[in-house]
Amino acid sequence: MSTEPVSASDKYQKISQLEHILKRPDTYIGSVETQEQLQWIYDEETDCMIEKNVTIVPGLFKIFDEILVNAADNKVRDPSMKRIDVNIHAEEHTIEVKNDGKGIPIEIHNKENIYIPEMIFGHLLTSSNYDDDEKKVTGGRNGYGAKLCNIFSTEFILETADLNVGQKYVQKWENNMSICHPPKITSYKKGPSYTKVTFKPDLTRFGMKELDNDILGVMRRRVYDINGSVRDINVYLNGKSLKIRNFKNYVELYLKSLEKKRQLDNGEDGAAKSDIPTILYERINNRWEVAFAVSDISFQQISFVNSIATTMGGTHVNYITDQIVKKISEILKKKKKKSVKSFQIKNNMFIFINCLIENPAFTSQTKEQLTTRVKDFGSRCEIPLEYINKIMKTDLATRMFEIADANEENALKKSDGTRKSRITNYPKLEDANKAGTKEGYKCTLVLTEGDSALSLAVAGLAVVGRDYYGCYPLRGKMLNVREASADQILKNAEIQAIKKIMGLQHRKKYEDTKSLRYGHLMIMTDQDHDGSHIKGLIINFLESSFPGLLDIQGFLLEFITPIIKVSITKPTKNTIAFYNMPDYEKWREEESHKFTWKQKYYKGLGTSLAQEVREYFSNLDRHLKIFHSLQGNDKDYIDLAFSKKKADDRKEWLRQYEPGTVLDPTLKEIPISDFINKELILFSLADNIRSIPNVLDGFKPGQRKVLYGCFKKNLKSELKVAQLAPYVSECTAYHHGEQSLAQTIIGLAQNFVGSNNIYLLLPNGAFGTRATGGKDAAAARYIYTELNKLTRKIFHPADDPLYKYIQEDEKTVEPEWYLPILPMILVNGAEGIGTGWSTYIPPFNPLEIIKNIRHLMNDEELEQMHPWFRGWTGTIEEIEPLRYRMYGRIEQIGDNVLEITELPARTWTSTIKEYLLLGLSGNDKIKPWIKDMEEQHDDNIKFIITLSPEEMAKTRKIGFYERFKLISPISLMNMVAFDPHGKIKKYNSVNEILSEFYYVRLEYYQKRKDHMSERLQWEVEKYSFQVKFIKMIIEKELTVTNKPRNAIIQELENLGFPRFNKEGKPYYGSPNDEIAEQINDVKGATSDEEDEESSHEDTENVINGPEELYGTYEYLLGMRIWSLTKERYQKLLKQKQEKETELENLLKLSAKDIWNTDLKAFEVGYQEFLQRDAEARGGNVPNKGSKTKGKGKRKLVDDEDYDPSKKNKKSTARKGKKIKLEDKNFERILLEQKLVTKSKAPTKIKKEKTPSVSETKTEEEENAPSSTSSSSIFDIKKEDKDEGELSKISNKFKKISTIFDKMGSTSATSKENTPEQDDVATKKNQTTAKKTAVKPKLAKKPVRKQQKVVELSGESDLEILDSYTDREDSNKDEDDAIPQRSRRQRSSRAASVPKKSYVETLELSDDSFIEDDEEENQGSDVSFNEED
């Protein structure tokens, strides 16, 4: 059958727009076919929204929605509109929508020549929204709206009344708007204006016969939507008020549904209170309302744009949702260390949005999805952080944590280990041969602290074998996994290595170790606090990641090594190992005096020798400890130690610690709770000790070490910081980097405003400025420092012997704390952050502190002290107790010009400058508000700021101080410090700190007085017995010649002479024979009476012995021959009387008197300090004055006592290098050995070049031994090795009487002949030396010959006797009066002699022999070569 071809005219048609809408309705109103959708509908029975599957025709719902939106838009045009009535007559298939308010104008359109109501509702593409220049927030947009409802209705009636014009307009359309009846206009004099639309949908076009329940439910929900999204209206549905006043009420309809759904999901009749879902509502501004709830399924949203229900969301939903997701993600990452993907957060959100958008654009006429760009919204909606924090308190946070944990668990399981026989990924692993095999559970993995410990552990494997032992080194400390993220754990190499090597599987519940490569884990760390911390971190890792593993007895082990070894040399050689410091301290106090011994501190495993490690592994019973399986509340203690959530509990845990509590080293099995409470706690305490100062001196350990080092070095002349730091490190056994010490030194010397009120060190160089708070200090190698003169007035030297000094690394280091004369913690303030504790104490005025100290002395009421900063010119206001506010200084110097001349203390210049520059230039968030800014600083602050008149007015309104950030708070509510007993204490007031300091300081002033009086009493006793000894010698009651040493000592004991120890303390009585022999061997033996090994090694390295307690007779037997003269006898009597008078005067003083004396001296020095500081900051650097060389220790006079501290010192050859003896000097200061009374140095004699330099000598003279040089100082090698033989000693002593007789009989002759001899010597010298004028007065000084002989001698009686006997034997005449030196000594001296003259000023003390260029650095003023 053939068909006729269709013509082109028939194929292409043109239809009217009305026909197009009816033929293609989906373009305008959506589908006209029945569809099943998941929709929220209003359920009348439960009075809430419920989500259910419904069968509706979207097009029918859309034409209903268009009429509702028209009614809602009228609220924007007429804010006085208050009511919308919706009546749905399902049986009649009729719907009515009526709104009050301003109606449609009832007039004929000028251009179209028809009534405006007819044009709007009966003609397509007519609207009042076509002016795009006018920003509108209505729903109508394209000119279709109500016309679409008219087109798809069989009957459409418009009714509008305008009371203002007194008319009512009614018009009817039928048959899909194809029939338009003429309008009926009547008079309207009563009632409000209104607009009403009544229509009957053309159900046949929608494939429907009636309005069923599904479509009615959706329509009713849409009426509720209008009521919730349009503000300040009443909506009635079928004559019933909906009673929804705002968007929040509307959102709550969904809350009931969520609650009911959760009940159904949980199978409960009623949900627990904690499970009730919450909806968080927030009205951001007049155009944005947001509500949030947790979604139980996936992301859900209910949103409205200008009352239009955007069921498909759009840019406005993304705008809000993205903000919430981003901020929640940031919180999870920063605060909770959790990582969750954005879609996982979004899928758990239910968002409600009601907004007004200017000229909104949608994807289609159905308006289900907004497409307007965010920048075109016409308003912004920034979700506040407070709202996000509220969201984080809902179930969303819990779900995110669960999701994150699940993500982490999956990620961590990917890195699980397995039991395999060989692992090749870790080159440093020393794998056990049996690891990963069926015998793997018998193997032990040794985890060592670092590579150095690994080598030692490997050495130990030589003892136990490598079949069942493996080793692996840890790099530093492990990660605290308790709050760590999965990403942190996965990136931690140590944790991943342990899992692989051990074969551990994350979160696996272990009941035995047969599935592991190793069945035991042994920790081998240093025996210090850091080693304990590593053990704790491993325990924390195992407990939190592998449940059940620590329940297996014997799984976790530790290998302990000694922390100190004591080597006993006498009476018998022995070695004692100590595994903790308290045990060592106990032995030192109770047992050490019985032995001669030395100690060795084992800082780490690297200190041990390989042989020692093999010995340790050979005795595993002693060195291997087992951690007991978890019991009781062990898990709680692990959580307490490592959980960040337990910070407050940890603070109390630390506060309750009793000093001296340690883990019992004899325990074979260590309970984990004991380990945490008795060993691990020491690490946390050490952290606090490093960070929080002591209330007595205000120092942290590093600062205390620096001050100790400066005192020990007597740092009176400047020294590079880069040189001082290593010196402090060495002399205080500092175990950390020198760089941190250098920074501490810089901090103690900083003098800019806001730093130290009293800087204890002088800043000779760029030590930082106020610009950056000291961060701009120069490098340590460029700057110098020295002790401030005021420092020793604050830390009085007389207190040094009273402190308890710490013993570390075989040496005495800094004290536990210093006791300044006023509380430096208040003078300079303090701040720091430790474990569980932090502190902030501002500085105060030293003079106010002293005033209150005197109030305490007088039992008077204390005055209130306020924070004070040296050199600061701002003001401080007390706003409430313990709270202050600091203000800078700002003044108006012109109409719109301001001058800032001071900042709040510790607000640095750079901070304010950055703020002002931001105000000058602005950025994306801040507009420029400063017109101009100048800086005119010198040492003081000066900003000149120019504002515009508008900004000046605004600044006045805000406040000058507020706008320029010239206000800073100070709080006294966190004043934490260690109390005198070593416990952390929080102080409630400044006066409480002062009172705590006062009573301890007063007690120590009494101790100082007692100590000084005791030392004076000892000196009186020593002088008394020296007088008695000399008298007995002179009167022949005591003979010491030609007697064995032990016999002399025994006779002295029988005569009641006490021994005096190094400290100057007398010991009466006789120690037992064994101890006496040790004393004599160590302190009194000559070189040939001891075996070579003992004399070379034992006496040199022994640091403790019985002689410390019992002392020796060196104060008698070490006196010079000159001491046996009558003059010396009388002088000793006079010295004894002087000491008795000094003691009597001291006893008259009270502790408060001594303290007041110190305070007065400080006040004088402090005023000088303030003057110098003000001059320095003002640019006038005070003159330090010239330093005088040669001033310092005087020479010993002929008849002064022997100094026992020098006799047994090892002789030191001067090989062109400087000799440093500051350690020994400091020990003398500490012990206050006042054996030599200091006086001014003798007048120096300027001569021609002396014979010792330029005179030609015979070979015999050059080879002859010097009769006056000290063998302990100048000799390169020992001469007269047989000098100590008893026979030779006897021969020397035989000549004592003869020498005494000669000295007595020739004394007058010597006085007469000495000048002549000097003249002869001078004339003789003139034959070989260039003439130089010599002052007659100095040249003729009497007894110069004898003085010179003694000056060059530092020898004992025996050495002087040796000189005299040599002279007697050689029968030398005049030349014997000239001191002779060896060739090396003479050449050494000659090298440093100036060409024009030679001045000789010799010091008998061996620690005075220091070259000139060393003097300033060593704090010694002794000079040998100086021109007058």
Curated annotation (Swiss-Prot):
Residues that hold Mg(2+) 2 according to the record: 526, 528
Domain Toprim: 443-557
Cofactor comment: Binds two Mg(2+) per subunit. The magnesium ions form salt bridges with both the protein and the DNA. Can also accept other divalent metal cations, such as Mn(2+) or Ca(2+).
Entries under SUPFAM superfamilies matching the protein: ATPase domain of HSP90 chaperone/DNA topoisomerase II/histidine kinase (SSF55874), Ribosomal protein S5 domain 2-like (SSF54211), Type II DNA topoisomerase (SSF56719)
Subcellular location: Nucleus
Names of required cofactors: Mg(2+); Mn(2+); Ca(2+)
Modified residues (Phosphoserine): 1087, 1252, 1266, 1269, 1272, 1353, 1356, 1408, 1423
Protein's UniProt keywords contain Lipid metabolism: no
Reaction equations catalysed: ATP-dependent breakage, passage and rejoining of double-stranded DNA
Keyword Transferase appears in the UniProt entry: no
Modification type Phosphothreonine: residues: 1086, 1258
Site positions for Interaction with DNA: 477, 480, 650-651, 700, 734, 740, 908
Domain called Topo IIA-type catalytic: residue spans: 692-1159
Pfam families referenced in this protein's UniProt entry, alphabetically: DNA_gyraseB, DNA_topoisoIV, HATPase_c, Toprim, TOPRIM_C
CC terms in the record's Gene Ontology section: DNA replication termination region; mitochondrion; nucleus; synaptonemal complex
Assembly with partners or alone: Homodimer.
Protein name, entry field: DNA topoisomerase 2
Organism taxonomic ancestry: Eukaryota, Fungi, Dikarya, Ascomycota, Saccharomycotina
